[in-house]
Design a protein with these regions (language model features):
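Domain-level marker for long, solvent-exposed, non-transmembrane regions
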Residues: 16-311
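Sec-dependent bacterial lipoprotein signal peptides
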Residues: 1-14
Length: 311
């Protein structure tokens, strides 16, 4: 029996003696992952190892929360991180130094949570400005004010999730009604489109595509629920122009009017033109109108957005 006890003790000492306490995994295992976020680094000197560990922590935060990168809140979170352990593994051949950068999750939460609460309160306050019954243009103006806060709230939540051991979101039920509010209010603004003249289908394609990219609802010009009206008249000049340098040249233009259908007011007018030369007359007409369509679509997007923001 004594021999058996002696053998067990001997095996225990051998096991303990074989445990390398200088490994990164062993040193990191001393920290409760529920309470701390720990990142390792190494270098030829203590300072190099410390700097590398802290830099690695900073890079991980920035990589997982790109929208918060470069902001004050990220700097404030990092201000709570410390390099708590620096050591040298004498048994390793490279004799490098190792370091651990440690971020207490509770301290990080103390920075992020108040900002989340404040942003939620601001969003709630703005949401109370929505009209009853709904007024598409007035509601969209409120949504424009909310959108920067929505983006800020989402960035803060990314940071909050990264700090949590379980990667949970902060009060998702509170933020859920606002996440897509801008898209919803934008889609509620119905735009009627009417194009008359040569190559009208070509023009319509560019205009509708631009409005869809903005997220606006597109309807027929005769729809009684339209909020904004886009009216375009296209023309083709020099349709019978002579060949120049072996090409048949054509010049196209469009007169565009943007109207507030609710107020029956034209808030923007402009003209665009373009020219193209090909070996075939029909191709010249089409390509010149495509150029007009691209220009018109770009200006419609810019002018309409400015009006919707300031109306």
């Amino acid at each position: 029996m004594k021999k058996l006890i002696t053998l067990c003790c001997t095996l225990g000492l051998v096991a303990c003696g074989g445990l390398n306490k200088n490994t990164i995994s062993y040193q990191m295992s001393k920290y409760d992952t529920q309470a701390y976020y720990v990142v390792a680094g190494d270098g030829a000197t203590k300072k190099a190892a410390s700097d590398q560990a802290f830099s690695a922590l900073q890079k991980e935060l920035q990589a997982h929360t790109p929208e918060a990168a470069g902001t004050q809140v990220l700097d404030d979170v990092l201000a709570n991180a410390k390099v708590e352990k620096v050591w040298r593994d004498k048994e390793a051949q490279d004799k490098h130094y190792y370091a651990l950068a440690v971020l207490p999750r509770e301290k990080a939460n103390a920075v992020v949570v108040p900002l989340l609460n404040r942003t939620d309160a601001q969003l709630t306050g703005l949401a109370q400005q929505f009209s009853t019954p709904a007024d598409p243009l007035a509601d969209l103006k409120v949504a424009y004010k909310m959108q920067p806060l929505v983006e800020h709230r989402a960035a803060l939540d990314d940071l909050y999730q990264f700090v949590q051991a379980d990667r949970s979101s902060y009060m998702p039920e509170t933020f859920a009604p606002y996440k897509n509010i801008f898209k919803e209010k934008m889609a509620a603004v119905l735009v009627g489109v009417e194009v008359n003249g040569v190559e009208s289908e070509t023009m319509v394609t560019y205009v509708i595509d631009a409005l869809n990219k903005m997220g606006l609802g597109v309807v027929d010009a005769s729809d009684p629920d339209k909020v904004v009206s886009v009216q375009i008249d296209t023309e083709v000049d020099n349709y019978s122009s002579k060949k120049v340098d072996g090409l048949i040249w054509c010049s196209s233009s469009a007169a565009v009017s943007l109207m507030d259908a609710q107020r029956d007011v034209t808030f923007s007018r402009f003209n665009v033109q373009d020219r193209a030369g090909t070996t075939r007359l029909n191709d010249s007409v089409r390509r010149s109108m495509q150029g007009v369509g691209r220009q018109a679509a770009a200006q419609i997007s810019t002018r309409l957005e400015n009006y919707l923001k300031t109306k």
